[in-house]
Amino acid sequence: MILAAFVGIPAALAIWVAILSKWQRGIYMLVLFVPFGSGLAVFMRPNPAGVLLKDFLFVLPIYAVFVLLHMRDFRQARIPSPISLMFVAFAALVLLQMFNPGVQNVIAGAIGIKVWLLYIPLAYLASAMILRAEDLITLLRLSTAVALIPLVVGLLQFLMSATVGYEETMTMFYGNEAAAVTQNFAKFQMGADFYRIPSTFSFVAQYSGYALMMLAITYMHQSVDPNMGWRLFAKIMTVLAFVAAILSGARTNFVFAPALLLVILFLDAKLSRMAIWLLLGPVIMIMTLQTAGLDVFAVADKTEGLVSNYGSDLVIPDLINSLVNYPLGKGVGSNTGGARNIMSVAELAALPHPVEGYYAKAIIELGVPGLVVLLMILFSIGVYALGIHRTTKEPMKRSCTAAITGFIIIMAVHSFKGWQIELDPINVWYWLLVGILFRLPELRFDTVVEARRQAEAVKKGRQRPTRRQRTAQRKRVPRYR
């Protein structure tokens, strides 16, 4: 404990000083931290401070510095006024539900408010921070580079689980917390064992969501970076993220990983990329499953059953039950995992059984009015995204709008079953991407395009000319006697 304080306090002070000197640094540091924050919180158990590290080290200091010293930068944000008004209405409903008689634990209610609202302002900060194409490229480079660690760790955990043993591998990584981060070593039989993999996170949903999200981010990166080496790295990371998403242990990624890529490729409408992924995507997926020892036909059969069963047995019944039983809501925190963890047995007994779907959760905590405003926000963001993409003509910019729009669409569909929008790290990245989306129409990629052209010209100049090129060159050069 003393050693942790001896190291942690100076580190926290250094982070806060860096944010104080330039608030944008806080966003970059936050992006580097989120792939490891929840995993670090696991090692800090039973100390509850671990789950708040991200907020107290980065999010709250960024907000404080921005509001107190840099509010003039708020004028740079490009979030449309109708969406901002919806945010205000949603925040009012969330705060109002704090006074719901169903909220018996004030701390649990505060956690519920934090989960619903804390990260939405990141959309404004991202929109105010990304003023040039170079700013976006810097953010994408950091995100792609740091993603190598959790993706490789996740694949290593799957490989070791298949060879050394699942419990042995997870215990090696997480010690006494191994059972907690793997849902008591849960696995599925699909010709071979299909393991729940947490990687550097605290459970599989976070890691699977991260791998899924990185498909959109690496697609953007490979489309806009002027450096050929970075573009190649981003392409490799796209494939790595796809494989990691498939082997994360989340069966829903058998559907959502290919679906996200298909939506992005369809929106981007680059025929060469579409052809490559339509040809190689199924091959990569089949090879990944076979290499892992999984039966392709068993996976397809179970995935089909999973989709139909989730709809008929879980998603629709949860929505209907929530609408019928809790039209006015039970109060914030009543269906939030972090809030329920600190409640007493008596408090939990008075609450409904928790549901997985984001929309059903909204009904339970915020009632029908909360669900309506939430759907208005998500639907409006999606409509704006499609509109921005439709009017964007510049190829680099269009690839970015395609990736973000595709991600927004998939998250909206995913939210019928899961809570990804409120889980690390998507609770941060969803709003960052929304902010970037609304900034994109004003970004100019002229310098990036010119830098790429110059790099390609230099590359061609260094290449040894072919025999035909040398012959043609000799014919063009006049000879004097």
Tell me what each language-model feature is.
Residues 12-14, 91, 95-99, 140-168, ...:
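Alpha-helical transmembrane segments of multi-pass inner-membrane proteins
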Residues 20-45, 55-120, 411:
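N-terminal hydrophobic segments of proteins, predominantly signal-anchor/transmembrane helices
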Residues 195-205, 349-385:
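A conserved mid-to-late transmembrane alpha helix and its immediate loop/hinge
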Residues 36-37, 45, 292-366, 385-392:
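Long extracytoplasmic/lumenal interhelical loops at the membrane interface
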Residues 152, 156-164, 243-248, 265-307, ...:
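A membrane-periplasm/extracellular boundary helix in multi-pass inner-membrane enzymes
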Residues 241, 258, 262, 366-412:
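Hydrophobic transmembrane alpha-helices and their immediate junctions
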Residues 65, 216, 261, 273, ...:
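Transmembrane alpha-helices of multi-pass inner-membrane enzymes
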Residues 17-27, 67-85, 219-236, 270-275, ...:
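Membrane-interface helix-loop-helix junctions at transmembrane boundaries of multi-pass membrane enzymes
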